[in-house]
């Protein structure tokens, strides 16, 4: 018998008889469905590139012209360097079209008030009648939270659909469905557009002649049906739909038009960078007359009077220079008149204390760290959460999409906003506008500076981990933000350094606290060059903890919390890393993406062999939270579906601990092909995007035509993800 393992038959029942592959999870033999070890061509990225999958539905020919299979002689060429590169990394340029109701789009002004000024002038392109809308509106999604979840198909034991009637409205209704938004909020702001409409309508007497006009807009009447619990929610005391951090419309308009006032930023930047004039405009300001805006940008009333409460562009400098010292110093920590003190951080006693010891900290995560996901992690036991990374420049320019990232749910008891940028002239104004818009109402407990993001797009602009090699610029940035934020603490998240083998975090840490005023620190135990390819260096994190403790003691400062980050995937690893390094806690990033219930494990100090049904319960919660956040109309349902699939593109990597030969599980271990303990567990482990969509249909109904999903990472998150530091 030859010694070649490829040619020698191996006993199928012996795991030890199979050669060990680096990074392969040790799954018990009885759950393996293929005794041949996985090879590169059987990776998850290959499985998701099979042509019958969602991404290839538009093909008329299943052959791939790129690899030469469509050549007449059918000779496949050898893969070149570009082919190999295309099969790994991110699926860049993903496009998710906004899917709304087909054909008919209702005017929102008419829908909410019954009045549309543009319609009277004949220039509104939207519909002002519900007639025709229900001809194309999809049927209600059938959903009840009390439906049983089981481990075998169909996985969700549904009840029968109760159709409302044969009329145009009734035939779309399911009178037995439950609206998750109504269940969560007590009302539904989506009215007739809700895809769970049967949960909040009732049959009334048919309308008589002459009452047809009353069926429009806010009268909430359509034929013999009347919608109930339809409330157009408004922001009250900073809160709307159990969420806060809704900047006022006038504030965003002022930011977009560069008419907002930044008195502290202007004074500070003039002090620390006198050679760089302060401007918020996209292009250099000229001495000519102000640019005349088009009528469709600024309505007549605002053009005449200016946005309420926001100084006009011409008043900014005069107001900043002429305000009395008392007026300028009204907000704590913002010293506009005392220029000799403006470039030093506030004293620790002037800031709120961050008592984070033992806190369960969810990392800021691009795309997948959205509000519904954070809410799910809080439900599992997370106590500290941070927004997705927001870029400083779009915040200062009033970009609606960027401000949506800082939204906070009422369940997030300790919440921070993470900001990325490379220069003081953007980061300091961003801190000032955050403090003035959402900081006053308690919408943010701390602001975190991203100093760890490794991606080229951020790094090449001097932001993220690039800041670690520019301590002079970094110091100006942090001190300015520290003062602009007033009593709101400033925290930093950073890596060991930029280049592998040349760490410099231990040199910066004493300055973070004693010179620049950071209120808490988080260190990711890898360099920018390493990304996520090597294990986190917890010995170096221990060195950094020692450097912090010594510098704080020497300066006679109160304790400053420091968290470690890297490879935490179980309660055992969490407490082992804490004990080994001396950190106050461990920030959880990828581990939470793959198993959000890790926070329950940490809280209860146990390894949870979670069942497939319990995992499906978590997926159902995410769907409910997503509908409350993004909406229960067609557009909201599809947005929720998209982000649910994003979550499943990570969660499918979880290997049930009951299937493993050893514990704890390791974050970067890939499983060979295996089956679960029941049919549902096998489905939840599927690397196919089509199966993730199938899982979403259990709670969000059948997919609409035109919906498709392409995972963000070709390797389905096996070490290739880009996170915010």
Swiss-Prot record:
Domain of life from the UniProt record: Eukaryota
Stretches for region Disordered: 1-26, 43-95, 275-337
Coiled coil: none
UniProt enzyme class: oxidoreductase
Binding, FMN: 364-366, 418, 493, 524, 565-567, 589-590
GO cellular component, one term: nuclear periphery
Gene3D superfamilies: Aldolase class I
Family membership: Belongs to the Dus family. Dus3 subfamily.
Full protein name: tRNA-dihydrouridine(47) synthase [NAD(P)(+)]
Biological source species: Cryptococcus neoformans var. neoformans serotype D (strain B-3501A)
């Amino acid at each position: 018998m030859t010694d070649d393992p490829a040619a020698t038959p191996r006993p199928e029942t012996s795991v030890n008889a199979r050669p060990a592959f680096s990074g392969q999870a040790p799954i018990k033999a009885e759950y393996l469905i293929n005794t041949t070890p996985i090879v590169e061509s059987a990776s998850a990225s290959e499985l998701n590139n099979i042509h019958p999958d969602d991404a290839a539905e538009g093909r008329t020919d299943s052959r791939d012209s790129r690899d030469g299979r469509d050549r007449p002689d059918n000779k496949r060429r050898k893969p070149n360097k570009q082919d190999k590169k295309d099969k790994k990394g991110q699926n860049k340029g993903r496009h998710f079209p906004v899917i709304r109701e087909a054909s008919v789009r209702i005017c929102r002004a008419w829908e909410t008030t019954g009045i549309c000024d543009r319609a009277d002038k004949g220039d509104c392109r939207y519909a002002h009648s519900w007639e025709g809308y229900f001809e194309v509106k999809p049927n209600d999604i059938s959903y009840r939270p009390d439906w049983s979840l089981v481990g075998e198909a169909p996985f969700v034991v549904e009840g029968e659909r109760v159709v409302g009637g044969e009329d145009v409205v009734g035939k779309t209704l399911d009178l037995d469905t439950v609206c998750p938004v109504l269940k969560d909020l007590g009302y539904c702001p989506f009215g007739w557009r809700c895809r769970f409409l049967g949960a909040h309508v009732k049959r009334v007497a048919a309308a008589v002649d002459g009452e047809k006009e009353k069926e429009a807009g806010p009268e909430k009447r359509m034929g013999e049906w009347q919608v109930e619990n339809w409330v157009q929610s408004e922001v009250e005391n900073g809160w709307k739909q159990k969420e806060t951090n809704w900047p006022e419309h006038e504030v965003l308009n002022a930011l977009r038009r560069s008419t907002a006032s930044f008195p502290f930023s202007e004074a500070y930047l003039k002090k620390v960078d006198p050679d760089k004039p302060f401007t918020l405009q996209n292009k250099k300001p000229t001495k000519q007359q102000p640019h005349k805006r088009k009528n469709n940008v600024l309505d007549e009333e605002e053009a005449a009077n200016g946005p309420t409460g926001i100084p006009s562009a011409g008043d900014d400098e005069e107001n900043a220079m002429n305000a009395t010292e008392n007026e300028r110093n009204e907000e704590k920590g913002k010293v506009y008149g005392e220029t000799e003190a403006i470039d030093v951080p506030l004293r620790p006693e002037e800031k709120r204390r961050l008592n984070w010891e033992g806190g369960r900290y969810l990392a800021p995560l691009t795309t997948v760290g959205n509000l519904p996901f954070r809410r799910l992690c809080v439900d599992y036991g997370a106590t500290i959460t941070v927004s997705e990374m927001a870029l400083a420049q779009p915040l200062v320019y009033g970009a609606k999409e960027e401000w949506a990232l800082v939204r906070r749910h009422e369940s997030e008891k300790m919440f921070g906003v993470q900001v990325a940028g490379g220069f003081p002239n953007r980061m300091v104004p961003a801190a000032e506008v955050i403090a003035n818009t959402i900081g006053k109402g308690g919408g943010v407990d701390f602001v975190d500076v991203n100093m760890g993001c490794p991606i080229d797009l951020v790094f090449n602009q001097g932001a993220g981990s690039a800041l670690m090699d520019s301590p002079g610029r970094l110091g100006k940035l942090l001190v300015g933000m520290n003062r602009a934020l007033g009593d709101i603490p400033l925290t930093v998240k950073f890596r060991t350094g930029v280049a592998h083998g040349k760490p410099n975090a231990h040199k910066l840490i004493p300055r973070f606290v004693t010179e620049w005023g950071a209120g808490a620190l988080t260190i990711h135990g890898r360099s920018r060059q390493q990304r996520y390819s090597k294990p986190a260096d917890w010995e170096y994190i221990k060195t950094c903890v020692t450097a912090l403790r010594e510098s704080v003691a020497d300066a006679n400062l109160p304790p400053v919390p420091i968290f470690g980050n890297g490879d935490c995937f179980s309660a055992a690893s969490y407490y082992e890393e804490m004990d080994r390094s001396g950190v106050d806690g461990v920030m959880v990033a990828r581990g939470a993406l793959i198993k959000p219930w890790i926070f329950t494990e940490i809280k209860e100090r146990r390894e949870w062999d979670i069942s497939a049904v319990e995992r499906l319960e978590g997926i159902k919660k995410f769907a409910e939270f997503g509908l409350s956040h993004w909406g229960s109309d067609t557009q909201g349902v599809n947005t929720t579906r998209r982000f649910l699939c994003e979550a499943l593109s990570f969660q499918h990597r979880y290997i049930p601990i009951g299937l493993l030969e050893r514990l704890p599980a390791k974050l970067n271990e890939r499983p060979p092909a295996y089956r679960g303990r029941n049919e549902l567990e096998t489905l939840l482990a599927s690397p196919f995007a089509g199966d993730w969509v199938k899982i979403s249909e259990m709670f969000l109904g059948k997919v609409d035509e035109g919906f498709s999903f392409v995972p963000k990472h070709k390797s389905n998150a096996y070490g290739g993800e880009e996170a915010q530091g």
